[in-house]
């Protein structure tokens, strides 16, 4: 096993982080997939699981899956703080020159990480888009509307903006300072990175049905709005508006 110093790596290297909220059925499987994908890259790596206040055995399962490997660690929120805050914590916790994030629900094939990694040569941000989404109908409708709003309000250029399969050069976050606490954070990072002139590539990736468990970020399970809370929708719209005002004013720091 490579020696792990806990210090930022020089040159090539990648931090892979996964936000997790009540993912006890998936987290060990995803850590195993991540290990295999990262080993295939042939560079130093680390894995960070960002536990967003899980009430199940997510942390326990993570610790059991990572015994003896100091390259894998858990960063925990004391309470559920939302998807945007989980991403911000993951970015802040990353120690390697490249930062990659994906979901912890098994909907993405981490074998595609190699293709994303290859695109970094000509890019500072590699943003994937789902070739064929395997999500419930209402979620597809919501995502279509969200992407359409993002396209109109922020003048296009982004395909499948909320796809959780992205690679960033860590140094871009010396300038790009995300403030969003919800899912708007993906759009915020891409918009600010574009404003600073960072290079971006987009590639298609496979998408699958959720491996186990239920949708957990910003959801509830019953009623007409079967997967999105009204409060979460309001928060998203407010933060979209705030981001548009922020970019219009040039407040990008």
Where are these regions (language model features)?
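Short beta-strand/loop segment that forms part of the nucleotide-sugar
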Residues: 43-54, 75-77
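A conserved acidic beta->alpha catalytic loop
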Residues: 51-60, 106
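Acceptor/aglycone-binding surface of glycosyltransferases and processive sugar-polymer synthases
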Residues: 71, 75-93, 98-101, 107-183, ...
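Acidic donor-diphosphate engagement hotspot in glycosyltransferases and nucleotidyltransferases
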Residues: 30, 58, 87, 111-113, ...
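N-proximal low-complexity "stem/linker" segments adjacent to membrane-targeting elements
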Residues: 1-36, 43
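Acidic helix N-cap motif at the loop->helix transition within catalytic regions
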Residues: 25-29, 56-65
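Residue-level signature of catalytic and energy-coupling elements of molecular machines
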Residues: 27, 34, 90, 105, ...
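Hydrophobic helical membrane-anchoring modules
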Residues: 1-13, 155-156, 178-253
């Amino acid at each position: 096993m490579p020696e792990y110093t806990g210090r930022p790596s020089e040159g090539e290297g990648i931090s892979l982080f996964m936000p997790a909220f009540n993912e006890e059925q998936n987290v060990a499987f995803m850590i195993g997939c991540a290990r295999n994908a990262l080993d295939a890259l042939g560079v130093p790596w680390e894995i960070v699981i960002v536990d967003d206040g899980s009430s199940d055995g997510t942390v326990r399962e993570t610790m059991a899956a990572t015994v003896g490997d100091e390259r894998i660690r858990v960063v925990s929120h004391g309470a559920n703080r939302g998807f945007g805050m989980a991403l911000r914590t993951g970015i802040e916790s990353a120690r390697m020159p490249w930062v990659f994030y994906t979901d912890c629900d098994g909907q993405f094939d981490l074998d595609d990480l190699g293709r994303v990694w290859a695109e970094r040569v000509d890019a500072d941000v590699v943003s994937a888009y789902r070739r064929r989404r395997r999500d419930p109908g209402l979620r597809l409708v919501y995502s279509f509307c969200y992407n359409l709003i993002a396209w109109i309000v922020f003048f296009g250029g982004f395909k499948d903006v909320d796809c959780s399969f992205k690679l960033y050069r860590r140094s871009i976050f010396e300038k790009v300072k995300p403030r969003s606490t919800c899912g708007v954070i993906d759009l915020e990072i891409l918009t600010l990175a574009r404003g600073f002139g960072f290079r971006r590539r987009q590639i298609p990736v496979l998408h699958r049905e959720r491996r186990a468990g239920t949708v957990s970020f910003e959801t509830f399970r019953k009623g007409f709005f079967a997967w999105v809370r009204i409060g979460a929708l309001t928060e998203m719209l407010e933060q979209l508006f705030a981001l548009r005002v922020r970019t219009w004013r040039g407040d990008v720091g």
